[in-house]
Design a protein with these regions (language model features):
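Low-complexity, glycine/alanine/valine/leucine- and proline-rich hydrophobic stretches
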Residues: 24-48
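Active-site-proximal flexible loops/turns
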Residues: 38, 59, 63
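Hydrophobic beta-strand positions in blades of beta-propellers and related beta-sheet-rich domains
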Residues: 50-52
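Intrinsically disordered, low-complexity polar regions and short flexible loop motifs
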Residues: 56
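Long, internal low-complexity/basic segments
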Residues: 63-127
Length: 127
């Protein structure tokens, strides 16, 4: 086995801990990182971030709205959607994890997912 060989084309990064504004699903490739921040309450707006990691390893310049990165963000969104579909199929039924299928769906408007956030919060507090 080659320890320097690539193992995954993409990896999902998931944060479902802490304040709901910090909950996010991200996808990372060798060169790019895409994050969808779904929270849109308390003055926040749902937003996307895209970083070109090989050129910007500290993630200082968000390329999500840069027209030169339109193809890259579309590709990263496809990867994101595949990881979300996997989460939807495989999420455990406790602690509100299944509700994140709605929370992280970038095509669902906040008005239709705010209840899912409340559902997640109430289920995670019932331990």
């Amino acid at each position: 086995e080659d320890p320097t060989a690539d193992i995954h084309e993409t990896i999902a990064l998931i944060n479902v801990w802490g304040h709901p504004a910090t909950h996010a699903l991200a996808v990372v490739t060798k060169d790019m990182k895409y994050i969808h921040w779904p929270y849109a309450a308390e003055g926040f707006e749902a937003t996307d971030e895209l970083y070109h990691l090989s050129k910007d390893p500290h993630e200082l310049v968000n390329k999500a709205d840069n027209p030169e990165y339109a193809a890259a963000i579309n590709q990263m969104r496809q990867h994101y959607d595949k990881h979300l579909a996997n989460w939807t199929r495989e999420a455990v039924s406790y602690n509100g994890y299944q509700s994140y299928s709605t929370v992280f769906d970038r095509n669902v408007k906040w008005a239709n997912k705010s209840d899912a956030f409340l559902n997640v919060q109430s289920k995670s507090k019932k331990k």
